[in-house]
Every structure is written in C-alpha cells, then in structure tokens.
Amino acid sequence: MKDIAKRFAENPLLSPNNIPPSTEGLEITCLLNPGVFQFKGKTWLIVRVAERPKQKDNIISFPVLTETENITIIEIDKNDPELIADDARVINYKGNDYLTTLSHLRLVCSDDGTNFYEPEDYPSLVGEGILETFGIEDCRVALIEGKYFLTFTSVSDNGVGVGLRTTTDWKNFEKHGMILPAHNKDCAIFEEKINGVFYALHRPSSVDIGGNYIWIASSPDGIHWGNHHCIVKTRKGLWDSKRVGAGAAPIKTAKGWLEIYHGANENHQYCLGAFLMDLNDPTKVIARTEAPIMVPTAEYEISGFFGNVVFTNGHIVEPDGDTVTIYYGASDEFVCGAKFSINEILSLLKEI
C-alpha cells in the first residue's frame, strides 16, 4: 500500500478538549470529518461534534433530541441482559438501535489553515424535527453560483438519510429537508453544473442484494434528485472490500472529475483512494486507484475513539492548481490536515 499523503506536522489540528461542549453536563468525545470551505478570506471547517453525558460507573448514558428539539438523557445499566454494546458508536437496547453520542455541526475558521478558532456570531447547526433526533453528521459543502450547499447525514430511529441546507452568509440557512431518504449518506454535490444540470455522488446501502456502493444522481435545481446510477462498487480482497463512499465535491481536471473517496475492509480499516469520471458525462468512471493513497499510520489515526480510520469530506484546491489540502477525521476523534499532489494522484489511476 502506497501512502502519498503529506500530513501536517501540527496534527492533530483539533482535539475534543479544544472546543467547549454545547450544553452543561455533556462532554465532547469526538471531533470528526469536517466539511471545508473558504469565506471572507479564511479557511473554514464545519466540524461534526459528538457529545454524550459524563459517564457513570456501570451505566451507559447517551443523549437524544426530542421532537421539540430538547435533549433527553437515556441511562441503561451495563449489566442489563437486553443491552448489546459491542460497538463504541452504536448500541442496541430492547431491539432498538441508538447512537452512543449526539452530533451537531460547529463552525471554526483559520487565517493560516492550521490554527482554528470558533468565531463569534456564527451559529452551530443542530438536528431539527423527527428525522434528526439522533443528530446530524459529516457535512459536505459545495459552493455553486454564490450559494453554499450543505449536505449532511440526518439520523433518527426512522433511519439515516441526507439532509440539505443552503446559505450565502453562514448566519441564515434555508432548510430543504431530507433530499435522499434512508438508508443514504456521503452526498457530495459537484461545484459546477454539467450541461446545465446539477450532479451529486451519494451512497445508498442495502442489507440484502447490493452493497455499500457509490451512486450518482442529477437534479435540475440541486434539491430534487433522480436519474440514479451506480458507478463505484467495493472490490473483494482489496482495501475497499466492505464499503466505499464519496469524499468532498469532485475536483475538475483536464482529464476528468477527480474524486477522493473512502473505503473500508472487513476489519473496519478506513483508507482513502481516488477515481476519475468523464468530464462531460460523470456517470462514466474511466479510472480508479488500485491501492489506497492514504492509510492510517500515524498514532492519532490508529488509536482513538474508533481507531484505524482516515476519513475526509472536505478539501481546498490551492492556487497552484496541483496541491489539494484535505482536512480529515482521524480515528473518529481528531481533526487533521494533509496535502496531496493532484498530478501524483492522477498518475496512480488505472484505466477501467
């Protein structure tokens, strides 16, 4: 496996203790998978912040949003025979699944792309309504014709789907509800229309026939989506054998639309790879990396809340046109940064 990422020497850039909890009595357990954008001359991250109550001995407790958008705390005895708690992220109690944390989205910004702080007078984004009672996660940001499109994972006991909000000033948001129903996530909208049409990558999942594959859809307005095509599947015996999912908005190059994506194997190791779509018809994938371009190797990527993970859904293409700076979640606990050469990634692609 070839790792071509140039990690920031300052990593991790953000840790759970760098940001205060949203509510008294909660603690931040994880900072994850930021969306990335530029605004007012600064680099901004919209970070997923996962919180839970401070834990008591022999008790598992976790927060849930009510339909009236208040937080309620559920407590379960660890010895309860109806509790299944084999995964740090999800538990099952009396046949129902619950997340062990509640996530919202927090804005931070930086003048240098390395040192981030919370600006004043910019709101956090939180779950709203019955489709987001378990929170909102993993926001991707696309800037299209002066408007920012925010796609994120909406989670509730109804399932996991894709929500959309739009903004021009990051203080006022228009809510468009759930644009892709359960079970779906990893939605990345292209930052340019192709032949007058919006396109987006997304990842529906099937528990029976099919799998965790990357699909593409089109839209006349960026809100209502259809014309779905499955374009990237898992590969048996390789690093992305269990699941694949889109990263951030595809990068336009002379050779095609370049997408940096995540893949995981049966051991739940998450790495990054890349594939290339046709410039005029992105439903056609024309090349893909065989090996990953980034593998969890640093200590902060291997050890954490859920270790052995690198996961990105945000990047910036630098002015030189070749350097792409990604911001990524490491071991489901830290926010980090790394740089790639677009030309080097393109050189590793194999035609399909």
Located regions from the model:
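Beta-rich carbohydrate-recognition and catalytic domains
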Residues: 1-134, 142-188, 192-242, 251-305, ...
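C-terminal substrate/ligand-recognition segments
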Residues: 313, 317
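Active-site lining segments of carbohydrate-active enzymes
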Residues: 139
